[in-house]
Amino acid sequence: MQIIIDHVRHEYAGVAALRIFHDLPGPLKAEKPDRIAGFVPDVYAFDAPLTVRIIGEAKTQADLETAHSQEQIAAFLAFLGQQEHGVFVLAVPWAAKRLAHVLVESKRAAVGAQSVRTTILDDLTLRREC
């Protein structure tokens, strides 16, 4: 999950007032992402005034193949598709990169979220834009 946070900080360094919430263990009362369509994202970021919303998820290859993860990804893409500038970042092991790309593109088409910018991060190349 840290790879997603680092990516967002780097890619959106010029965005004023960017807030990043994450689901990493931390101090009590640390701000965590809110549920979106019943799912809690690993990373949720936005700025003020609102110009971008970013949702990040970290998945293993086995996770990508579960119905839960596929429903979660579809829900996040659908939510972001309703935003003016939605961004979805998915971090996976290098071996799962192709599967992740196919899954994200399939779900993005299924929910009508073609306007959502997507990025697939992996542990070797660190970044691959869809």
Q: Language-model features: where?
A:
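Arginine/glycine-rich "motif VI" loop of SF2 helicases in the C-terminal RecA-like domain
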Residues: 77-85, 109-113
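Structural beta-sheet core signal
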Residues: 55, 89-90
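Active-site metal-binding core of divalent-cation-utilizing nuclease and nuclease-like domains
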Residues: 14-51
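Well-ordered, non-membrane alpha-helical segments in soluble/globular domains
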Residues: 1-4, 67-76, 100-105
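Nuclease catalytic cores
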Residues: 1-9, 13
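Conserved catalytic cores of phosphodiester-cleaving nucleases, focusing on short active-site segments
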Residues: 41-69, 76
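Domain-level recognition of nuclease-like catalytic cores that cleave nucleotide substrates
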Residues: 91-130
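Structural motif
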Residues: 22, 58-60, 92-95
